From Swiss-Prot:
Enzyme class (EC, first level): isomerase
Listed name of the protein: Serine/threonine-protein phosphatase 2A activator 1
Source species taxonomy: Eukaryota, Fungi, Dikarya, Ascomycota, Saccharomycotina
Main location: cytoplasm
Function statement: PPIases accelerate the folding of proteins. It catalyzes the cis-trans isomerization of proline imidic peptide bonds in oligopeptides. Acts as a regulatory subunit for TAP42-associated PP2A-like phosphatases modulating their activity or substrate specificity, probably by inducing a conformational change in the catalytic subunit, a direct target of the PPIase. Can reactivate inactive phosphatase PP2A-phosphatase methylesterase complexes (PP2Ai) in presence of ATP and Mg(2+) by dissociating the inactive form from the complex.
A GO CC term attached to the entry: cytoplasm
Pfam families, alphabetized: PTPA (PF03095)
Assembly, per entry: Interacts with the phosphatase PP2A-like catalytic subunits PPG1, PPH3 and SIT4. Forms a ternary complex with SIT4-TAP42.
Outcome reported for the amino acid change (mutating D205G): Abolishes PPIase activity and fails to activate PP2A phosphatases
Biased composition (Polar residues): 335-356, 365-386
GO biological process: autophagy; cellular response to stress; DNA repair; G1/S transition of mitotic cell cycle; mitotic spindle organization; regulation of transcription by RNA polymerase II; TOR signaling
Region: Disordered, residue numbers: 328-393
Additional observations: Present with 4590 molecules/cell in log phase SD medium.
Compartments (UniProt record): Cytoplasm; Nucleus
Species annotation: Saccharomyces cerevisiae (strain ATCC 204508 / S288c)
Length: 393
């Protein structure tokens, strides 16, 4: 079973279905071909973008046709925002116009994907539609988080596994993700999207994680010679200077624009990284470890990652056999049937009746965070300062 290619044309494709219902199926996910393909492509894109420390912020096209094709679809999604202005008046939990935006996406995306792909690949559209459609937040909860961010990476990986990105370079990775993050920040601001499953002040970021991995990787080969060092991200003017060419600065700049107060209070994890981790290579390594624990192994996040039979199948990586499948409750099946678009996440009510995993909003322990972000020869003072600061707050 290949991690970098689907067995085209022998692979079969189907509308993705829910397979993760509880703690046990979250554990099953860890032995799936799907997660190994996710990890393979995460490593691939992180490596590629490490050779793209100073991309052209004005570039709009690639030498790879399918990169341009996906960019074109993303442009159309951006135009949908222009077509769908937010409803007037204050809204506490997201602007309801966002549901209309998602409705338009669901209606038009299949045709756009068919126009983007060669005709012999049209059978992959049901799977590709799910992953790309689920990359922009929940139309039900009007929120956005790391699971949706993961879904966009899965979209890029799916096209990659079809061989659509020959000779891909770091600049191509930057083009695609830069377009995606530009749209996502606009969606968040236009429709006031809530954080999905946020840990609050004790999370890395309200909405994103992968953006910081990609951004730290951009500078990890330069390390001491990088334009900025980790500590300097606390300087707002320097962050603004590099936000157009570095994803880490892009993420920090967005926080600076939408949050008030001292950075160490509203973003203590990112602050802790800045003041305790001296090199970008160590930042990237720590964030990758944190991503594995806080995203890929967290039920509240991965429960909304669904599985088809082509790109991310629910099969064992060792022998290719099907992983355990549990039937949905009857009322859940009815709810899904009535919810509309069949491959899209529709509800957040499908939590297991009992699980040892924390629900959304429960912060990870300070010890775990320090472990994930620790670096060699860190002083005892640095190891304990974050825990003391957390207790004081």
């Amino acid at each position: 079973m290949s991690l970098d290619r689907v067995d085209w044309p022998h692979a079969t494709f189907s509308t993705p279905v829910k397979r993760i219902f509880d703690t046990q199926t979250t554990l099953d996910f860890q032995s799936s071909l799907a997660i190994h393909r996710i990890k393979y492509h995460l490593h691939k894109y992180t490596t590629l973008i490490s050779h793209c420390s100073d991309p052209d912020p004005h570039a709009t096209a690639s030498s790879i046709a399918m990169v341009n094709g996906l960019m074109g679809v993303l442009d159309k999604l951006a135009h949908l925002i222009d077509e769908t202005p937010p409803l007037p008046g204050p809204r506490r939990y997201g602007n309801l116009a966002c549901r209309e935006w998602h409705h338009k996406l669901d209606e038009r995306l299949p045709q756009w994907l068919q126009e983007m792909l060669p005709s012999e690949y049209h059978e992959v559209v049901p799977e590709l539609q799910y992953y790309l459609g689920n990359s922009f937040g929940s139309s039900t909860r009007l929120d956005y988080g790391t699971g949706h961010e993961l879904s966009f990476m899965a979209t890029v990986a799916a096209l990659d596994m079809l061989g659509m990105f020959p000779h891909m370079r770091g600049a191509d990775v930057f083009l695609l993700f830069n377009k995606y993050y530009t749209i996502m920040r606009r969606l968040i601001l236009t429709y006031t999207l809530e954080p999905a499953g946020s840990h609050g002040v004790w999370g890395l970021d309200d909405h994103f994680h992968l953006v910081y991995i990609l951004g730290s990787s951009q500078w990890q080969l330069l390390d001491a010679q990088a334009p900025l060092q980790p500590r300097e991200i606390l300087d707002k003017s320097l962050v603004r200077e590099y936000k157009d060419t570095n994803f880490y600065c892009q993420g920090i700049n967005f926080i600076n624009e939408v949050k008030m107060g001292p950075f160490e209070e509203h973003s203590p994890i990112l602050y802790d990284i800045a003041v305790t981790v001296p090199r970008w290579s160590k930042v990237c390594k720590g964030l990758l470890k944190m991503y594995s624990v806080e995203v890929l192994k967290k039920f509240p996040v991965v429960q909304h990652f669904w599985f088809g039979t082509g790109f991310f199948p629910w099969v064992n990586i060792q022998n290719g056999t099907d992983l355990p499948v549990f039937e949905e409750k009857e009322e859940e099946s009815i709810e899904q049937a009535n919810a509309g678009s069949p491959g899209r996440e529709q509800t957040s009510t499908r939590f297991p009746t009992s699980t040892s995993m924390p629900p959304p909003g429960v912060p990870p322990s300070g010890n775990n965070i320090n472990y994930l972000l620790s670096h060699q020869n860190q002083s005892h003072r640095n190891q304990t300062s974050f825990s003391r600061d957390r207790l004081r707050r």
